[in-house]
Design a protein with these regions (language model features):
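Structural recognition of the beta-strand scaffold that forms the well-ordered cores
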Residues: 17-20, 81-86, 119, 142-146, ...
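Short, Lys/Arg-enriched charge-dense amphipathic segments
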Residues: 20-25, 106-110, 156, 166
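Substrate-binding rim/cap in mid-to-C-terminal beta-strand-loop elements of soluble/periplasmic
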Residues: 26-50, 126-135, 144, 154, ...
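Short linear motifs at secondary-structure transitions and domain/linker junctions
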Residues: 58-61, 118-121, 154-162
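Formylglycine-dependent
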Residues: 2-81, 87-101, 105, 115
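A long, amphipathic alpha-helix that forms part
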Residues: 66-73, 101-141, 158
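Histidine-centered active-site microenvironments of extracellular/periplasmic hydrolases
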Residues: 5-14, 93-98, 130-167
Length: 167
């Protein structure tokens, strides 16, 4: 959401090894034409360059982001690094491969794709943490997890005591 043009691009803000989609989300106005979360084209900026080039990536976008993160930590395992991994999951329009949403179709949930996106994210996060362990760097890596999409499935406050907020 910070902009697609200089001086607001990731490479203008100090990031040296970047894979990103343009605009606020995959498939939005200034993103690469035809991106739909699967087998998309994203901009890659390689270390030592400032201008990126568009590159086709295979797979689901969240899998791509984590695969690139694992490539990055593997390449930088012997020196201090900062990895900023901002995914679009779970976020509308809630697209995910059917095998991730399928287990939630049997449940009484209003959006199985939302929960499928979370399951896919959790799987990928586990792979990344395992990679840190396999590389022997988990004990010297500060790992922060933050999210801003927790209410995307809706808010349920009926079970809470909201009497103080009623006035």
């Amino acid at each position: 959401h910070l902009g697609d043009n200089a001086p607001h691009r990731p490479q203008d803000r100090g990031f040296q090894d970047v894979v990103w989609h343009r605009c606020g989300g995959v498939g939005q106005a200034s993103d690469h034409w035809g991106n739909d979360y699967f087998d998309d084209t994203y901009e890659r900026v390689r270390p030592g360059t400032r201008e990126g080039s568009f590159e086709k990536f295979e797979g689901y976008c969240t899998d791509v982001w984590f695969r690139e993160a694992m490539r990055f930590v593997t390449a930088n395992k012997d020196k201090p690094f900062f990895l900023y991994l901002a995914t679009n999951a779970p976020h509308g329009p809630f697209r995910v491969a059917p095998e991730w949403a399928e287990p939630y179709r049997k449940e009484e949930v209003n959006n199985p794709n939302f929960f499928g996106m979370i399951a896919n994210f959790d799987h990928n996060l586990g792979l990344l943490r395992k990679r840190l362990g396999d590389l022997g760097i988990s004990e010297r890596t500060i790992f922060l997890f933050l999210t801003d999409n927790g209410t995307a499935a809706g808010c349920r406050f009926e079970e809470l005591d909201n009497e103080p907020s009623l006035g």
